[in-house]
Amino acid sequence: RWRFICCLFLFAVAISVSAQAVKKTKMVKIETTLGTIKVRLYDETPLHRDNFLKLVEESFYNDVLFHRVIKDFMVQAGDPESKSADSTARLGSGGLGYTIPAEIKFPELYHKRGALAAARLGDMANPERASSSCQFYLVQGKCFTDQELDEVEHRLNMVLRSTVPFKYSEAQRRQYKTFGGTPHLDGQYTVFGEIVEGFDVLDKISAVETSKGDRPKEDVKIISMKVVKR
Protein backbone atom coordinates (compact mmCIF):
# COMPACT_ATOMS: atom_id res chain seq x y z
CA ARG A 1 0.00 0.00 0.00
CA TRP A 2 2.77 2.44 0.92
CA ARG A 3 4.46 1.69 -2.40
CA PHE A 4 1.20 2.51 -4.19
CA ILE A 5 0.85 5.81 -2.30
CA CYS A 6 4.49 6.67 -3.05
CA CYS A 7 3.93 6.02 -6.76
CA LEU A 8 0.84 8.23 -6.73
CA PHE A 9 2.82 11.00 -5.02
CA LEU A 10 5.67 10.79 -7.56
CA PHE A 11 3.15 10.81 -10.41
CA ALA A 12 1.48 13.91 -8.97
CA VAL A 13 4.85 15.65 -8.65
CA ALA A 14 5.72 14.78 -12.26
CA ILE A 15 2.39 16.15 -13.48
CA SER A 16 2.91 19.33 -11.45
CA VAL A 17 6.41 19.87 -12.84
CA SER A 18 5.15 19.23 -16.38
CA ALA A 19 2.29 21.68 -15.90
CA GLN A 20 4.69 24.32 -14.60
CA ALA A 21 6.95 23.81 -17.63
CA VAL A 22 4.02 24.30 -19.98
CA LYS A 23 2.89 27.34 -18.01
CA LYS A 24 6.33 28.92 -18.26
CA THR A 25 6.52 28.53 -22.04
CA LYS A 26 6.45 32.06 -23.41
CA MET A 27 4.72 32.87 -26.69
CA VAL A 28 4.64 36.25 -28.39
CA LYS A 29 2.22 37.34 -31.11
CA ILE A 30 3.76 39.76 -33.61
CA GLU A 31 1.18 41.80 -35.51
CA THR A 32 2.65 43.22 -38.72
CA THR A 33 1.23 45.14 -41.65
CA LEU A 34 1.43 41.91 -43.66
CA GLY A 35 -0.12 39.58 -41.09
CA THR A 36 0.47 37.84 -37.77
CA ILE A 37 3.44 35.74 -36.66
CA LYS A 38 3.55 33.81 -33.39
CA VAL A 39 6.90 32.88 -31.85
CA ARG A 40 7.90 30.64 -28.97
CA LEU A 41 10.80 31.79 -26.80
CA TYR A 42 13.35 29.24 -25.59
CA ASP A 43 13.96 28.71 -21.88
CA GLU A 44 17.51 27.62 -22.80
CA THR A 45 18.35 31.28 -23.49
CA PRO A 46 16.91 33.05 -20.41
CA LEU A 47 18.78 36.36 -20.81
CA HIS A 48 17.46 36.85 -24.34
CA ARG A 49 14.01 35.53 -23.44
CA ASP A 50 13.60 37.89 -20.49
CA ASN A 51 14.99 40.89 -22.35
CA PHE A 52 12.64 40.29 -25.29
CA LEU A 53 9.65 39.88 -22.97
CA LYS A 54 10.54 43.08 -21.13
CA LEU A 55 10.61 45.04 -24.39
CA VAL A 56 7.34 43.46 -25.51
CA GLU A 57 5.64 44.37 -22.22
CA GLU A 58 6.94 47.95 -22.60
CA SER A 59 5.46 48.13 -26.14
CA PHE A 60 8.95 48.95 -27.41
CA TYR A 61 8.45 47.16 -30.72
CA ASN A 62 5.24 48.96 -31.64
CA ASP A 63 5.74 50.85 -34.94
CA VAL A 64 9.24 49.45 -35.52
CA LEU A 65 10.07 48.59 -39.15
CA PHE A 66 11.48 45.49 -40.75
CA HIS A 67 14.42 47.53 -42.00
CA ARG A 68 16.45 44.76 -43.64
CA VAL A 69 14.91 42.07 -45.83
CA ILE A 70 16.87 39.53 -47.88
CA LYS A 71 14.85 36.86 -49.69
CA ASP A 72 15.91 33.27 -48.97
CA PHE A 73 17.92 34.54 -46.00
CA MET A 74 16.22 36.53 -43.22
CA VAL A 75 14.14 39.56 -42.22
CA GLN A 76 15.47 41.92 -39.54
CA ALA A 77 13.73 44.40 -37.24
CA GLY A 78 14.09 46.14 -33.89
CA ASP A 79 16.01 49.33 -34.68
CA PRO A 80 14.36 52.07 -32.56
CA GLU A 81 15.50 54.68 -35.08
CA SER A 82 13.19 53.12 -37.66
CA LYS A 83 10.08 54.37 -35.87
CA SER A 84 10.48 57.91 -37.18
CA ALA A 85 12.75 57.27 -40.17
CA ASP A 86 12.06 58.79 -43.56
CA SER A 87 12.40 56.72 -46.73
CA THR A 88 16.05 57.70 -47.28
CA ALA A 89 17.36 56.88 -43.79
CA ARG A 90 19.97 54.14 -43.44
CA LEU A 91 18.89 51.90 -40.60
CA GLY A 92 20.37 49.08 -38.56
CA SER A 93 22.70 50.77 -36.09
CA GLY A 94 20.14 51.76 -33.44
CA GLY A 95 20.02 50.23 -29.98
CA LEU A 96 19.26 50.81 -26.31
CA GLY A 97 22.75 51.39 -24.99
CA TYR A 98 23.50 47.88 -23.78
CA THR A 99 24.21 44.39 -25.13
CA ILE A 100 23.18 40.90 -24.03
CA PRO A 101 25.86 38.28 -23.32
CA ALA A 102 25.88 35.58 -25.98
CA GLU A 103 23.79 32.47 -25.27
CA ILE A 104 24.84 30.42 -28.28
CA LYS A 105 23.46 26.93 -27.56
CA PHE A 106 24.63 25.26 -30.74
CA PRO A 107 24.08 22.55 -31.93
CA GLU A 108 20.87 22.21 -29.87
CA LEU A 109 19.51 25.54 -31.14
CA TYR A 110 20.24 26.24 -34.78
CA HIS A 111 19.21 28.40 -37.74
CA LYS A 112 16.36 26.34 -39.15
CA ARG A 113 13.59 28.06 -41.11
CA GLY A 114 11.58 30.17 -38.66
CA ALA A 115 14.37 30.60 -36.12
CA LEU A 116 14.28 33.80 -34.05
CA ALA A 117 17.79 35.10 -33.40
CA ALA A 118 19.54 38.19 -32.06
CA ALA A 119 21.40 40.56 -34.36
CA ARG A 120 24.84 41.78 -33.31
CA LEU A 121 27.97 43.61 -34.39
CA GLY A 122 30.59 41.63 -36.32
CA ASP A 123 33.40 39.64 -34.74
CA MET A 124 36.07 42.30 -35.27
CA ALA A 125 34.19 44.82 -33.13
CA ASN A 126 32.48 42.21 -30.98
CA PRO A 127 34.66 39.11 -30.43
CA GLU A 128 32.45 37.92 -27.56
CA ARG A 129 29.46 37.87 -29.94
CA ALA A 130 27.25 39.81 -27.54
CA SER A 131 23.77 40.46 -28.92
CA SER A 132 21.99 43.69 -29.73
CA SER A 133 19.70 44.93 -26.98
CA CYS A 134 16.70 45.00 -29.30
CA GLN A 135 17.41 44.01 -32.92
CA PHE A 136 16.43 40.52 -34.04
CA TYR A 137 15.90 38.52 -37.20
CA LEU A 138 13.63 35.74 -38.39
CA VAL A 139 15.14 33.11 -40.67
CA GLN A 140 13.51 32.32 -44.00
CA GLY A 141 16.53 30.62 -45.52
CA LYS A 142 16.58 28.07 -48.31
CA CYS A 143 16.97 24.31 -48.71
CA PHE A 144 20.44 22.75 -48.79
CA THR A 145 21.83 19.55 -50.28
CA ASP A 146 23.89 17.00 -48.36
CA GLN A 147 27.00 18.19 -50.20
CA GLU A 148 26.34 21.80 -49.19
CA LEU A 149 25.79 20.74 -45.57
CA ASP A 150 29.06 18.79 -45.68
CA GLU A 151 30.79 22.02 -46.72
CA VAL A 152 29.10 23.93 -43.88
CA GLU A 153 30.25 21.27 -41.42
CA HIS A 154 33.81 21.62 -42.70
CA ARG A 155 33.76 25.40 -42.24
CA LEU A 156 32.23 25.06 -38.76
CA ASN A 157 34.92 22.60 -37.72
CA MET A 158 37.58 25.03 -38.92
CA VAL A 159 36.05 27.68 -36.63
CA LEU A 160 35.14 25.50 -33.64
CA ARG A 161 38.42 23.54 -33.60
CA SER A 162 36.83 20.96 -31.31
CA THR A 163 38.60 17.69 -30.47
CA VAL A 164 35.45 15.88 -31.63
CA PRO A 165 34.47 16.92 -35.19
CA PHE A 166 30.99 18.42 -35.43
CA LYS A 167 28.35 16.71 -37.56
CA TYR A 168 24.72 17.67 -38.06
CA SER A 169 22.27 15.09 -36.74
CA GLU A 170 19.99 13.30 -39.18
CA ALA A 171 17.06 15.38 -37.88
CA GLN A 172 18.97 18.63 -38.46
CA ARG A 173 20.01 17.55 -41.96
CA ARG A 174 16.42 16.63 -42.76
CA GLN A 175 15.28 20.04 -41.50
CA TYR A 176 17.80 21.91 -43.64
CA LYS A 177 17.18 19.74 -46.73
CA THR A 178 13.38 19.73 -46.53
CA PHE A 179 12.35 23.00 -44.90
CA GLY A 180 15.49 25.11 -45.16
CA GLY A 181 17.36 27.59 -43.03
CA THR A 182 20.71 29.38 -42.85
CA PRO A 183 23.23 26.85 -41.51
CA HIS A 184 26.23 29.09 -42.25
CA LEU A 185 25.11 31.26 -39.29
CA ASP A 186 25.12 28.34 -36.84
CA GLY A 187 27.32 28.74 -33.80
CA GLN A 188 27.81 32.46 -34.40
CA TYR A 189 24.55 34.12 -33.29
CA THR A 190 22.19 33.48 -30.39
CA VAL A 191 19.03 31.67 -31.49
CA PHE A 192 16.42 32.28 -28.78
CA GLY A 193 13.09 31.24 -30.26
CA GLU A 194 11.18 30.01 -33.29
CA ILE A 195 8.06 30.70 -35.31
CA VAL A 196 5.14 28.41 -34.49
CA GLU A 197 2.51 30.17 -36.64
CA GLY A 198 2.72 32.57 -39.56
CA PHE A 199 5.33 31.12 -41.89
CA ASP A 200 3.26 32.48 -44.77
CA VAL A 201 3.67 35.99 -43.32
CA LEU A 202 7.43 35.46 -43.06
CA ASP A 203 7.42 34.57 -46.76
CA LYS A 204 5.33 37.65 -47.60
CA ILE A 205 7.79 39.93 -45.83
CA SER A 206 10.73 38.17 -47.48
CA ALA A 207 9.20 38.70 -50.93
CA VAL A 208 8.78 42.50 -50.79
CA GLU A 209 10.78 44.71 -53.13
CA THR A 210 13.81 46.28 -51.54
CA SER A 211 16.09 49.21 -52.29
CA LYS A 212 19.62 50.14 -51.24
CA GLY A 213 20.65 48.58 -47.94
CA ASP A 214 18.01 45.82 -48.33
CA ARG A 215 15.33 48.12 -46.93
CA PRO A 216 11.79 47.48 -48.22
CA LYS A 217 10.62 50.09 -50.73
CA GLU A 218 7.29 50.17 -48.92
CA ASP A 219 7.49 50.08 -45.13
CA VAL A 220 6.70 46.78 -43.44
CA LYS A 221 5.85 47.64 -39.85
CA ILE A 222 5.39 45.82 -36.58
CA ILE A 223 2.04 47.12 -35.37
CA SER A 224 2.32 45.52 -31.94
CA MET A 225 3.66 42.58 -29.96
CA LYS A 226 1.79 40.80 -27.21
CA VAL A 227 2.61 37.94 -24.85
CA VAL A 228 0.03 35.18 -25.35
CA LYS A 229 -0.63 31.90 -23.55
CA ARG A 230 -0.44 29.49 -26.51
Model-found features: residue ranges?
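Bacterial N-terminal signal peptides that target proteins for export
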Residues: R1-C6
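A periodicity- and composition-biased signal for non-globular, repetitive helical segments
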Residues: C7-F9, S82
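Hydrophobic h-region of N-terminal signal peptides that target proteins for export
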Residues: F9-S18
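Cyclophilin-like peptidyl-prolyl cis-trans isomerases
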Residues: V17-R230
